[in-house]
Regions:
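Single conserved hydrophobic/aromatic residue that forms the stacking wall/gate
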Residues: 1-20
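Domain-scale recognition of functional cores that engage charged ligands
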Residues: 21-272
């Protein structure tokens, strides 16, 4: 999406895992280079699937946070291309009418809405109680709150212990955490961009993000597994899924071992 962090000029070949210091616009990429990115096309298709008859859809975020607002603008544009009528409403301008329906700043009833706002925060707000009866379709759906809660990690490990795609994880205070030894990562159940994450390496706090506002709740402990490092950057690969199909790949790099809100989105290219 339109992240304010996209300001880096290193390019990584996914197959060769090699760096090229020259910028992409200099025309140095080979003619057969490709990028794994079908995000726009798949989102347009998905909007049409969810709303086959078109219609009015609200989009909401914090209006003053530039990165979130630009992301929502991008989605509004795709919704319009899909034949919908997007309408933005700031998250703090959503109200409740006498019939228990959510309304926007112009008193239009919100029937369907994409919100760039955490479900866990939404469920703590004053308007959480009317949600089940407000007759509003919310994108992303409420079950996505389970995936953004790190409590799922110990539960997955408990059900699928030893799975190669999982790291050993326990709720803090669980006797099982002793098997992690003296190297692990301490994470809040709710946290974003590395906030309040601490990395313990051989019994020593090797790196920590002390701010972020997530330090008061419960924590998990997860086995320490360092991300790959190229030159002076630690790199992680992320992906977007639209519906049930992969739609794009992202590379984020950070100078530290914890990926933070200052990490960089790095363009990529793929060669056969």
């Amino acid at each position: 999406f339109f992240s304010s962090r996209r300001r880096h000029t290193r390019y990584i070949s996914v197959t060769g895992v090699q760096t090229c210091a020259l910028p992409i616009w200099a025309g140095v990429l080979p003619a057969d280079a490709d990028q794994f990115n079908s995000l726009s096309e798949k989102l347009i298709t998905r909007f049409r699937t969810i709303f086959p008859n078109g219609g009015f859809v609200h989009f909401s975020s914090d209006a003053d946070f530039v990165e979130d607002r630009q992301t929502v603008r991008f989605l509004e544009d795709l919704a319009q291309q899909a034949g919908l009528e997007p309408q933005f409403v700031a998250i703090d301008q959503i109200g409740l009418n006498a019939d228990g329906r959510f309304v926007d700043h112009e008193n239009w009833i919100i029937q369907a809405m994409f919100k760039l706002y955490p479900w866990e925060q939404m469920l703590r707000d004053d308007y959480a109680a009317p949600l089940p009866t407000a007759d509003v379709r919310v994108l992303e759906p409420a079950w996505k709150s389970i995936l953004s809660n790190k409590a799922i990690l110990p539960l997955l490990w408990e059900r699928h212990k030893g799975h190669p795609n999982l790291l050993e994880a326990y709720f803090e205070g669980d006797p099982g955490q002793a098997t992690l030894g003296n190297s692990y990562v301490r994470k809040p159940l709710f946290s974003r961009e590395g906030a309040n994450v601490e990395l313990i390496d051989r019994g020593v706090s090797a790196e920590a993000v002390v701010d972020g506002g997530y330090g008061q709740g419960r924590f998990i402990r997860q086995a320490l597994h360092d991300t790959p490092r190229f030159d002076d950057a630690h790199v992680i690969v992320g992906s977007w899924v639209v519906g049930d199909e992969p739609a794009g790949m992202s590379l984020r790099e950070d100078a530290g071992r914890i990926t933070r809100d200052t990490s960089r989105f790095v363009p990529h290219f793929i060669r056969d």
